[in-house]
């Protein structure tokens, strides 16, 4: 096992001037499970392929442990890779597929069999060792691909969207198995996905990329609670965070018919940038619903005593999920229509076409600079 270091590693494809990966700088600890996540074209798979030796590194360096592997061929890096497609040999049994790399390396049959059986036991594949891949389900085939990587006992596992071909239910159970197995083996793992739910549930840390640039690397909890900028705020979380540009007013920001208090430091930082507005982020679960004619929360002040507190939201769609419900609606903010998502109790969902008044909880408010997108609140 070993640590992995991306030291300002860059990749520029021939014929392009814009880097696909731009000075990526991440230190991955020995035994850590790091997830690279981002939209299509952000550079996450390219970063993984650079680490694997399948892409040239045009600037910076990549190290595995104390070794600079920047220009080493893949076979000399002591890594094992699991792909989106299983890449199993259809004419070979499960056991032969899992042990094939060891056979090519000249390991004796007894040792190969022992390692294959040990990996099969970990992956619940013992009863399938004599079967061909066509006799397995998608989840079982993916576990065979995992087993093939495990028997090699590499220093680093690389996984490129290994769950993309599985159905939703199987994806949930398999991601749990992969995370549990990685913790048991303690092998440093770099995992690529476009699914931020996978990223949050599997990784010790998550690295978010956009247009080849690292936006933030942090624990899943910190990334959810303290996104570094507007992109991360809008990308991490399902349903996504509501992002609303609101005017700065005395002591806070104007939110519908209420003034929501915001720290003076954040407002000063926005003013120093010449901004007269800030963009506030509110998770769907951090809205309070105000009854018609009811008062605002104690921490809020109202512009008018006649109107309900907060922002009027027209209910367009309601998703009932048992314990919770999600209201998808629209509101007028600064003369523009904004789509909002509000979480409500599963037993108290509003009717489609009705109107809610909502206020954000001040302690849960995220404040970003409208001009730059960077976070202003602690």
Question: Can you describe what each PLM-predicted range is?
Answer:
Residues 1-3, 11-23, 72-76:
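A short, flexible loop at the N-terminus of ABC-type nucleotide-binding domains that lies
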Residues 5, 27, 63, 357-359:
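ABC ATPase nucleotide-binding domain
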Residues 15, 55-63:
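Conserved post-Walker A/P-loop segment of ABC ATPase nucleotide-binding domains
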Residues 37-39:
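The feature captures the beta-strand-to-loop junction immediately N-terminal to the Walker
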Residues 52:
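Helix-to-loop junction immediately C-terminal to a conserved catalytic motif
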Residues 61-63, 67, 213:
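ATP-binding/catalytic-site motifs of ATP-hydrolyzing domains
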């Amino acid at each position: 096992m070993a640590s992995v270091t991306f030291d300002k590693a860059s990749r520029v494809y021939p014929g392009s001037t814009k880097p696909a990966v731009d000075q990526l700088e991440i230190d991955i600890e020995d035994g850590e499970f790091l997830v690279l996540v981002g939209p299509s074209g952000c550079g996450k798979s390219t970063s993984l392929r650079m680490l694997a030796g399948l892409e040239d590194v045009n600037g910076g360096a990549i190290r595995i442990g104390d070794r600079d592997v920047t220009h080493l061929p893949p076979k000399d890096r002591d890594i094992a890779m699991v792909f989106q497609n299983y890449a199993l040999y259809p004419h070979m049994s499960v056991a032969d597929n899992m042990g094939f790399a060891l056979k090519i390396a000249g390991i004796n049959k007894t040792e190969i069999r022992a390692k294959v059986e040990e990996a099969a036991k970990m992956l619940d594949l013992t009863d399938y060792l004599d079967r061909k891949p066509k006799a397995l389900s998608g989840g079982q085939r993916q576990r065979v691909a995992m087993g093939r990587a495990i028997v090699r006992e590499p220093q680093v596992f690389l996984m490129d969207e290994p769950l993309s071909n599985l159905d939703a239910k199987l994806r949930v159970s398999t991601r749990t198995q992969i995370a549990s197995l990685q913790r048991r083996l303690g092998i440093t793992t770099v995992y690529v996905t476009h699914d931020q739910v996978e990223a949050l549930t599997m990784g010790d840390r998550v690295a978010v990329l956009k247009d080849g640039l690292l936006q933030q690397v942090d624990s899943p909890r910190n990334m959810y609670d303290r996104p570094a900028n507007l992109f991360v705020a809008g990308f991490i979380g399902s349903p996504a965070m509501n992002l609303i540009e609101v005017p700065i007013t005395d002591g806070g920001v104007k939110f519908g018919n209420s003034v929501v208090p915001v720290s003076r430091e954040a407002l000063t930082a926005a003013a120093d940038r010449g901004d007269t507005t800030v963009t506030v982020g509110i998770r769907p679960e951090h809205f309070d619903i105000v009854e018609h004619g009811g008062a605002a929360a104690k921490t809020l002040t109202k512009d008018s005593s006649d109107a309900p507190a907060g922002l009027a939201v027209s209910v367009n769609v309601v998703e009932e999920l048992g314990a919770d419900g999600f209201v998808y609606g629209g509101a007028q903010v600064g003369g523009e229509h904004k789509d909002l998502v509000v979480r409500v109790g599963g037993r108290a969902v509003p009717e489609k076409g009705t109107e809610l008044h909502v206020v954000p909880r001040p302690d849960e408010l995220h404040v970003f600079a409208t001009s730059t997108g960077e976070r202003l609140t602690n």
